[in-house]
């Protein structure tokens, strides 16, 4: 079996919003990468034994006091190093170069001229000048710049406003770029990263979907042995892929618990049972807990309170069911790599909590189960590819995100069965028409929201005084920022008419045209 972790790239995070993007780009090249804090220490780096190191960008200024620096071992380990933006600046400062703050931050598109036929950039270009020099279309985002090269370095790139936009010490294999090769705005960014990872670091393409699945199955079997595993199955992408993976790895040793909260999408419970219990032969215990959830949410209007109640009750019910499974020794969870990174990052205490996380909180300590997280090394796009490899339906694997509390946070204010039933039907019509008009995969997330207010309407000769729903559709790459989807007016008109005509109790449909920021994607 191929050792998919034998060759790896270490990414030291200096706080850039693009750090995860660097890791994903490296993995897309078939090479395993991990993100760790810039101050992880020399011992850790030596033990990690990377084939190469990438220093990320970051929001700080190298010219300030007490700002982040790379551990000394980065430059003594003898492996190739690539500094990006802040990573370039700290490399320059630490190795004897000079960095200064610029009067005007450079942010956005720029054109870079390549110099000196460096191993990193040679032959990579978007255009050429009349004199034959290569030009690159790139993305810049910096407030400092290198104004003096460190000893041993040569100039490899420049722009009109940044005379030193790239530098290299070819002998020590240290390279640095002021621009961001990881973002799509830098058109040749993938080729630059490929040159660094595959040629300069000499990594082979071992990180492939087939190899990842084979590795995960082997590791699960070695760790679990003949013991039983319990998994909370929600119907979401992550838990569904874990279920499929464990079914392939350990078969009948897996039992899934599917808690039907009464806050799921239309027919979702039946779809989950059909896919896993009937089609894949997974042992699934379905718990109809609608009454318990609705009772617990009675009179509760605050979104955070609703989240906590739903999370606590889910854990309670899951705990009850898991206790009934004889000889269960392991709890499987759909933790993915961004969860691991965010959890590590939150320990710094610098992040502000906008909303408590959708995923269910920790299980009670009384539950004496060991944890198995087969997806904890994987990004979401990798999880989806594995789902397809394991035979899950495309529609399930590429389904839009759905919050852990379900419709509980898409019904504004108090949750009632009547509201949930109306919302389920409106949401189903919206999604059905998105599929029918080939728009579902063109938006990143789409759903309906129930507004607990009544609006007057007219049906035939009579007046109606019924509820309002809002439709929400957004386009985004990372869900950190999003723009509202400009769906065709004729399409919105059709969806609105269907909802109002087919669902007694709804008299008005609105469309949410708020971006993120300032709004969040979910309403609560």
Swiss-Prot record:
ATP binds at residues 234-240. This is GMP synthase [glutamine-hydrolyzing]. GO terms for cellular component: cytosol. NCBIfam families: guaA_Cterm (TIGR00884), guaA_Nterm (TIGR00888), PRK00074.1 (NF000848). Pathway: Purine metabolism; GMP biosynthesis; GMP from XMP (L-Gln route): step 1/1. CDD domains: GATase1_GMP_Synthase, GMP_synthase_C. The keyword Membrane does not apply. It catalyses: XMP + L-glutamine + ATP + H2O = GMP + L-glutamate + AMP + diphosphate + 2 H(+). Catalyzes the synthesis of GMP from XMP. The active site is at residues 85, 180, 182. Residues 207-399 form the GMPS ATP-PPase domain. Homodimer. Residues 8-206 form the Glutamine amidotransferase type-1 domain. The keyword Aminoacyl-tRNA synthetase does not apply. Its EC number is 6.3.5.2. GO terms for molecular function: ATP binding; GMP synthase activity. InterPro entries: Class_I_gatase-like (IPR029062), GATASE (IPR017926), GMP_synth_C (IPR001674), GMP_synth_GATase (IPR004739), GMP_synthase (IPR022955), GMPS_ATP_PPase_dom (IPR025777), NAD/GMP_synthase (IPR022310), Rossmann-like_a/b/a_fold (IPR014729). It comes from the Bacteria. Keywords: ATP-binding, Glutamine amidotransferase, GMP biosynthesis, Ligase, Nucleotide-binding, Purine biosynthesis. It comes from Methylococcus capsulatus (strain ATCC 33009 / NCIMB 11132 / Bath).
């Amino acid at each position: 079996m191929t050792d998919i972790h034998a060759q790896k790239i270490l990414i030291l995070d200096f706080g850039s919003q693009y750090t995860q993007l660097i890791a994903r780009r490296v993995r897309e090249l078939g090479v395993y990468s991990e993100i760790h804090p810039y101050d992880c220490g020399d011992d850790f780096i030596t033990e990690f034994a990377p084939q190469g190191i990438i220093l990320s960008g970051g929001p700080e200024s190298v010219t300030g006091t007490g700002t982040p620096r790379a551990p000394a071992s980065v430059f003594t380990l003898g492996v190739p190093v690539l500094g990006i933006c802040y990573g370039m600046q700290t490399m320059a400062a630490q190795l004897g170069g000079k960095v200064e703050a610029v009067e005007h931050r450079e942010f956005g598109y720029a054109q870079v001229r390549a110099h000196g036929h460096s191993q990193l950039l040679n032959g990579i270009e978007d255009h050429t000048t009349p004199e034959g020099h290569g030009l690159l279309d790139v993305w810049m985002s910096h407030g400092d710049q290198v104004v003096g090269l460190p000893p041993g370095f040569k100039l490899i790139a420049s722009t009109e406003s940044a005379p030193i936009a790239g530098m290299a010490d070819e002998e020590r294999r240290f390279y640095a770029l002021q621009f961001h090769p990881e973002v799509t705005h830098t058109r040749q960014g993938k080729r630059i990263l490929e040159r660094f990872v595959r040629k300069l670091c000499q990594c082979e393409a071992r990180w492939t979907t087939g190899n990842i699945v084979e590795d995960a199955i082997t590791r699960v079997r070695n760790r679990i042995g003949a013991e039983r595993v319990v998994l909370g199955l929600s119907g979401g992408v992550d838990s569904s892929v874990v279920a499929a993976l464990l079914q392939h790895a350990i078969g009948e040793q897996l039992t899934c618990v599917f808690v039907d909260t009464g806050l799921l999408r239309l027919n979702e419970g039946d779809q989950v049972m059909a896919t896993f219990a009937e089609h894949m032969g997974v042992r699934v215990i379905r718990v109809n807990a609608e009454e318990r959830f609705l009772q617990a949410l009675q009179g509760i209007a605050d979104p955070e309170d609703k989240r906590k109640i739903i999370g606590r009750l889910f854990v309670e019910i899951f705990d009850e069911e898991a206790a009934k499974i004889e000889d269960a020794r392991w709890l499987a969870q759909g933790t993915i790599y961004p969860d691991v990174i965010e959890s590590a990052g939150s320990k710094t205490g610098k992040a502000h909590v906008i909303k408590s996380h959708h995923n269910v909180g920790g299980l009670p300590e009384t539950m004496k189960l060991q944890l198995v997280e087969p997806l904890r090394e994987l990004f979401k796009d990798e999880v989806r590819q594995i789902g397809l490899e394991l035979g899950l339906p495309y529609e399930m694997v590429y389904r839009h995100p759905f919050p852990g509390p379900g419709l509980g946070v898409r019904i504004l204010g108090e949750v009632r069965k009547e509201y949930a039933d109306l919302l389920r039907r409106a949401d189903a019509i919206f999604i059905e028409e998105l599929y029918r008009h080939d728009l579902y995969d063109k938006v990143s997330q789409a759903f309906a929201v129930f507004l607990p207010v009544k609006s007057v309407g007219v049906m035939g000769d009579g007046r109606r005084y019924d509820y309002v729903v809002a439709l929400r559709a957004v386009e985004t790459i990372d869900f950190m920022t999003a723009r509202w989807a400009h769906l065709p007016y004729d399409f919105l008109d059709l969806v609105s008419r269907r909802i109002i005509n087919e669902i007694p109790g709804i008299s008005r449909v609105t469309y949410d045209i708020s971006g993120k920021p300032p709004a969040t994607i979910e309403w609560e």
